[in-house]
Regions:
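Condensing-enzyme catalytic core of the thiolase-fold
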Residues: 1-124
Length: 124
């Protein structure tokens, strides 16, 4: 199965909205840094080839990663995208650990959202 996505957000109205709330950095993104002052907008796309682990092993594929758990959250009842819920983030990560059968202390890498905003970084 191929799974892909794109993010096209550089239209003027979107840029203006993030700029108006002070979410955009005037220089560069520095997530989880005391000097963080917002993020830099960008666009991108990606596609992954997903396959059952047993099939990939049987086919002799060069396996780069295994998805063992997934957790998600939506802050629809909260203040919205600009003020993420710490509770929701904790629930999402807890679900992923539970599905994967891992303890948090065994995780070696976390791919964070890293918005370089005070609220977003503090929540993560």
């Amino acid at each position: 199965m191929l799974a892909g996505a794109t993010d096209r957000c550089m239209e003027a109205p979107t840029y203006a909205k993030f700029s108006a709330i002070g979410a955009l950095s005037p220089s560069h993104s520095t997530p989880f840094d005391a000097r963080a002052n917002g993020f830099v907008m960008g666009e991108g796309a990606g596609v992954l080839l997903l396959k059952r682990l047993s099939d990939a092993i049987d086919d002799g594929d060069d396996i780069k990663a295994v998805i063992r758990g997934v957790g998600g959250s939506s802050d629809g009842r909260g203040k919205g995208i600009t003020a993420p819920s710490q509770r929701g983030q904790v629930q999402a990560v807890s679900r992923a650990y539970s599905q994967a059968g891992y303890e948090p202390s065994t995780v070696e890498l976390v791919e964070a959202h890293g918005t370089s905003t005070k609220v977003g970084d503090a929540t993560e």
